[in-house]
Amino acid sequence: MRDHIVIKGARENNLKNIDVEIPRDALVVMTGLSGSGKSSLAFDTIFAEGQRRYMESLSSYARQFLGQMDKPDVDSIDGMSPAISIDQKTTSKNPRSTVGTVTEIYDYLRLLWARVGVPHCPKCGKEIRRQTVDQIVDQIAALPQATRVQILAPVIRARKGEHQKVFDDARRGGYVRVRVDGSIYDLTETITLDKNRKHNIEIVVDRVVIRPDQNRRLTDAVEIASALSGGLVLADIPEEKREILFSQNYACDDCGISIEELTPRMFSFNSPYGACPTCGGLGTRLRIDPALIIPDPSKSILDGGITASGWNGVKNESISRMYYDALAEKYHFDLATPIGDLPEHVREILLYGTGDEELTLHYDTNRGSGVLRRPFEGIVCNLERRYQETQSDAMRASLEDCMAETACPDCHGARLRPEVLAVTVGGLNISEFTALPITEELAFLDRLTLSEKDAQIADSILREVRSRLHFLQSVGLQYLTLARSAATLSGGESQRIRLATQIGSSLMGVLYILDEPSIGLHQRDNEKLLATLRELRDLGNTLIVVEHDEDTMRAADYLIDIGPGAGVHGGEVVCAGTPEEVARCERSITGQYLSGKMKIPVPAQRRTGNGHALVIRGASEHNLKQVDVQIPLGVMTCVTGVSGSGKSSLVNEVLYKTLVGKLNHAKVRPGKCDGIDGVEYLDKIINIDQSPIGRTPRSNPATYTGLFDDIRSLFASTQDAKLRGYSAGRFSFNIRGGRCEACSGDGLLKIEMNFLPDVYVPCEVCKGKRYNRETLEVHYKGKNIAEVLDMTVEEALAFFQNQPKIRDRLQTLMDVGLGYVKLGQPSTTLSGGEAQRIKLATELSKRSTGRTIYVLDEPTTGLHVADVARLIDILNRLTDAGNTVLVIEHNLHVIKVADHIIDLGPEGGDAGGSIVFTGTPEDCARCAESYTGQFLKKELEGERSSPFLIG
């Protein structure tokens, strides 16, 4: 068997006909600047070829359902293994997917609860046990010898009526006695019951004395009693004045509730047999949220304090104003009073109505005036009714602005039916178990005690569950719960979950290709991840990891540096070998940083800010423990902490959502906190995340940054355009006139292929240029509009050197390291890091007010350390303009250059949510309680930066 994967002539995207040899059964890290060609080699070449070869091994019938894969642009790849890609782009957004379902642990839990779960009555909570005839007989026969037992069949339990038919049937059946409400009656006499009272009626089947020779008779009596009552047997022991009720069913005999045979599907919230009927197994419902109807309680009704559709009371002649005037008159309040200062009962009436109480409404319209008397249904009730009744998508969308996901009123977020939630193992139902963090779940399973029979049944199930939970713990996800929605996971978390699943499968001889598995992981947990990767390698697999993390690079068996630059300046193998060999390579930027020859310097002086601060009081969203924290304004603040410590809850849920509501007037429900002070010192908040800059190929860097407007205006000002009467609109590919109508300005035509994936082919009319012939005849400096869109930022900067407005925008794109990106490159082809840097460039090109707060969540994702240096420069420029920059980050290069650190923890999940430290990086490095401080201390001392320093 080959000991290397040999790639010859790889030319995919920007790769320059490169040859690479990758050792098998090794941990191989590919690194290089953003856009250098790492993903082109790892995913678009190696993985794509592995997938294509697997597809070719299938039958043509199977292939028609899977679609056809193009051969990558490569001469040959030898020594390939079956390839599995674990990237960050395949995170499930389905609200039904949870950590438990994605890892398949929930399937084992469903089996466990179905096989050894103890059912209880969902109404009274009494344990329900089902017993066979033999088990019932054995229990009765175990009573002391010579004990007299009366076997009864409970045919009526707590039901009103005279029940004469029951007595008649018993007589016809040959039975002599019945017990009614505790008293024995002979069936030969007339029994009269009060039909308005509840009664208990039991037929006396037999009277038995406990002796070994009476077992046959006892068995017959139990079988008859069970048949008469539908599975119930009552053993009355007069001498002991006690009764024992036995049941062959899962049913509560007190409440009359029965449960069917327990099966795994009953515990699935994706099955109609188990899902809560109210929410359909989602655990949440979309409901009108009063906080979104009244986003600013400091405003009055007359000031537009109520923003819901149809209920703005600013206009005098509106119907809503007619109701408000009537309410104010009846309940004696002033419409000019801030809504938050109105009495509680008045706010309740505004939201939920007057019930049956009528209002006196005075109307005055073009058709006449008069008085009406009618109840007021309330704004919340009105909006919910309109949402249910409307046929208009626009109205539905408008009303959804006032709605929020709330826990289901019946299952309270547990997703399952009440009878399913009443089944417990070790005292917990399946929902309560999955709501525990993984560490607590493991502890629960370790102390779980089962009967000998149940332990035998559960042994193999528990072994599988434990091993999978341990794998999740080994990749640093011990703070997650199995009930956590997969849609709320970060890219790094979802990737590590799939990594844990792969370890659990114990495959060998596989080629795994991973995309930055360290994203979102604190340095403390990095060693766990590396141990996991080594374990996967030691099983006999080859790992190709696209990664920028220095710890991972140093742990690699083989390191491949792609570059030297990005885009057209990349696509070559700069250096390949052990980490030590790459560190000695003068040409490798990665090597320069590994050796310590290049470093991101620590600032000589920290900014102190403008004297003002944002003060968050009593933040308690998710795992935050009523934290109070100050964020100084005019500085760069880094929020740090181990994974799951509460960073995103504090910054994204509490701070961002509160400020975006107050400053940008967005309708969002902020995370729980007592209040935020200091908002008056800011004028806007901007979240610069890694979401795409557009959802369609029509969106591109030129359109997003506003650059294209200036370019179109420039083309419209040329002599050719003026002679033809062309305006700037002529050079838009989004509107009729200048665009190619054959493809509507897309440049591509979509061919639907039924079973096969849709195929995009260049438009035959415009040859992919998007514009019609007449528009392309207009030139500026010898280039038409399509040729300009095909330029890289770097080429365009030289081309538009004499156009200051365009040049300045292009320069900001160069400053953020996007010189290799084409102006017209579809936004759908840009990585998350590239999209984020385009947003940063757009902000840099705007005139600063010095009162903006920028929020960034792990902006170093996908960035090489050289790109991180450039990012830090941009963040410094934004801060130096007087703005405030707030960054959630694990990258020590960013943390060490921050002016202020807020460290959360100490652990993740329930053990987190507290402020461990606030202050400068130097003070943080001296804080022994801070995990971040421990690693920051090494970074500031320079130990971590240069283990391969060449003397």
Language-model segments: residues:
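Conserved phosphate-binding elements of NTP-dependent enzyme cores
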Residues: M1-G951
